[in-house]
């Protein structure tokens, strides 16, 4: 029987990720969430002047230079009566694979939308991934301190394009230079906008009731009248917030504000901590695992090399699914069938690491990894479980990688295998030659790999074009047919970083022909870890 203290710890966990299109203001929101959670004293904005603070969650050198989040960071902080685990995900075009995998480790998501632009391409793609698990979504319409589109129009777009009903919780009063604040529909109060920057959280003035004459006085009669009119429309056209519909991903509560101006983020956090689910039941291949089970279980969704330049180590990020982690406990590393003792797990505040003494279902902990842990690995207190749904995506872009100094082949291979294990890039070794082919989902990943090979492995490498259009993992239940396929397709076959057989196609036509000629072979565009 689970004890009340443990159940209390699990029920106050809220584990969520932020998803958005690049430049919708995600990193700024992350900062301000941490600021309101008192996790940092000063929010560092990303694209600042030369001496500006760098954002707390962007801690790798290249991220600091470019002002983009390249890797997923994990930050934990208390808010209201909850303990929040925030997983920051790369917002830049090119880092989708890491982001997809991170979405498998959360119980809810915050979707950030630039209110001037509405629903953008990257947001659509990420929402497809959240759909697979019916993840509950809270929405924050950002940048109200700039000129934005008609809010009603943007809500319609979310409903039509993402298939979710929108229930506004707050509503903007003006925008751009005329932005005066928001009306909180649930609390029946107007919160007036005062711009706060960096680490200043402004005292806000609150006006009770929509018909309060003080509202006309503060925002002007004509704006007050038009807001009352708008709200009448909104109340008629939009559904009321329905908690059940939210929990199955059918309805999203919507908040308005400006992350840069420190305004509206706290309203959103209040809603998220009140409504988002505590850690949920999760499917393993063998059975469903409840978060409140006594016995520990967890899965690895990301591996990060060299988080600490002073220690050239790797950290495996593990989502705890059930039970409690205690320092020094023994666990079963299921894939290897090995008992391991974990005494030095870490908890995260982006880049600052502190030793974890206890962690509970819903928490993310870091395990020191010396090459034995892979993405998708499960750890339990004995039971052989395998959690499903942690995807690997076939790359869309390919380059041949070559050394400037041929004597460093060993270091190059080691670096590439480590980077592929953490999901930064995929590596393919053709069966018929000694080439090393790197595959990625976006161009920027190639730059990241070369930069990291240089700074972490002291290897200088350059890229060349390669005649590869796409790759597919190949599988077949019939060993004889697989052998025949291998014999006839030697020139197109390679092994990936995990030694899985892969078909490398110079053109899509070539791939289609191979699929026609070998109907018994399964050509897969995704592979579970």
From Swiss-Prot:
This is Peptide chain release factor 3. HAMAP family: Rel_fac_3. It is found in: Cytoplasm. Pfam families: EF-G_D2, GTP_EFTU, RF3_C. Keywords: Cytoplasm, GTP-binding, Nucleotide-binding, Protein biosynthesis. Its main location: cytoplasm. Increases the formation of ribosomal termination complexes and stimulates activities of RF-1 and RF-2. It binds guanine nucleotides and has strong preference for UGA stop codons. It may interact directly with the ribosome. The stimulation of RF-1 and RF-2 is significantly reduced by GTP and GDP, but not by GMP. The keyword Protein biosynthesis applies. Residues 11-280 form the tr-type G domain. Coiled coil: none annotated. Belongs to the TRAFAC class translation factor GTPase superfamily. Classic translation factor GTPase family. PrfC subfamily. GO terms for molecular function: GTP binding; GTPase activity; guanosine tetraphosphate binding; translation release factor activity, codon nonspecific; translation release factor activity, codon specific. GO terms for biological process: regulation of translational termination. The keyword Transport does not apply. GTP binds at residues 20-27, 88-92, 142-145. PANTHER family: PEPTIDE CHAIN RELEASE FACTOR RF3. One of its GO terms (cellular component) is cytosol.
């Amino acid at each position: 029987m689970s004890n009340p203290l443990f159940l209390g710890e699990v029920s106050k966990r809220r584990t969520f990720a932020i998803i958005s299109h690049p430049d919708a203001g995600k990193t700024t929101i992350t900062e301000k969430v941490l600021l309101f959670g008192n996790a940092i004293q000063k929010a560092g904005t990303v694209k600042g002047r030369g001496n500006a603070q760098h954002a707390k969650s962007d801690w790798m050198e290249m991220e600091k230079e470019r002002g983009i989040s390249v890797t997923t960071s994990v930050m934990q902080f208390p808010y209201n009566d909850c303990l929040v685990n925030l997983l920051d995900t790369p917002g830049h075009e090119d880092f989708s694979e890491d982001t997809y995998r991170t979405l498998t480790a959360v119980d809810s998501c915050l979707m950030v939308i630039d209110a001037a632009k509405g629903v953008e391409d990257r947001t659509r793609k990420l929402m497809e991934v959240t759909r697979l698990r019916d993840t509950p979504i809270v929405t924050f319409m950002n940048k109200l301190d700039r000129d934005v589109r008609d809010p009603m129009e943007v809500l319609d777009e979310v409903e039509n394009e993402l298939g979710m009903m929108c229930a506004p919780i707050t509503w903007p009063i003006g925008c751009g230079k005329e932005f005066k604040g928001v009306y909180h529909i649930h609390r029946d109060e107007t919160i007036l906008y005062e711009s706060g920057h960096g680490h200043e959280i402004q005292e806000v003035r609150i006006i009770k009731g929509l018909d309060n004459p003080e509202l006309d006085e503060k925002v002007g009669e004509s704006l007050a009248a038009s807001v009352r009119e708008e709200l009448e429309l909104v109340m008629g056209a939009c559904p009321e917030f329905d908690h059940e519909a939210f929990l199955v991903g059918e309805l999203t509560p919507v908040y308005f504000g400006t992350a840069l101006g420190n305004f509206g983020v706290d309203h959103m956090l209040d809603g998220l901590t009140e409504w988002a689910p505590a850690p949920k039941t999760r499917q393993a291949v063998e059975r469903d695992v409840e978060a409140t089970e006594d016995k520990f279980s967890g899965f690895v969704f990301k591996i990060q090399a060299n988080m600490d330049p002073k220690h050239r180590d790797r950290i495996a990020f593990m989502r705890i699914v059930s039970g409690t982690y205690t320092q020094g406990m023994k666990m079963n590393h299921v894939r290897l069938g090995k008992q391991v003792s974990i005494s030095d797990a870490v908890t995260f505040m982006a880049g600052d690491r502190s030793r974890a003494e206890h962690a509970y279902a819903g928490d993310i902990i870091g395990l020191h990894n010396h090459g034995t842990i892979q993405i998708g690995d499960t750890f339990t207190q004995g039971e052989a479980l395998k959690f499903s749904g942690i995807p690997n995506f076939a790359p869309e872009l390919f380059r041949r990688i070559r050394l400037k100094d041929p004597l460093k082949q060993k270091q190059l291979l080691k670096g590439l295998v480590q980077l592929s294990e953490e999901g930064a890039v995929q590596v393919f070794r053709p069966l018929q030659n000694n080439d090393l082919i790197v595959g990625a989902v976006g161009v920027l990943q190639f730059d990241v790999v070369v930069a990291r090979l240089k700074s972490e492995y002291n290897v200088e490498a350059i890229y060349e074009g390669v005649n590869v259009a796409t790759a597919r993992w190949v599988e077949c239940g019939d060993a004889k047919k697989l052998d025949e396929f291998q014999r006839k397709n030697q020139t197109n076959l390679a092994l990936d970083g995990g030694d899985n057989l892969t078909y490398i196609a110079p053109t899509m036509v070539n791939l289609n022909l191979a699929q026609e000629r070998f109907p018994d072979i399964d050509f897969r565009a995704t592979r579970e870890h």
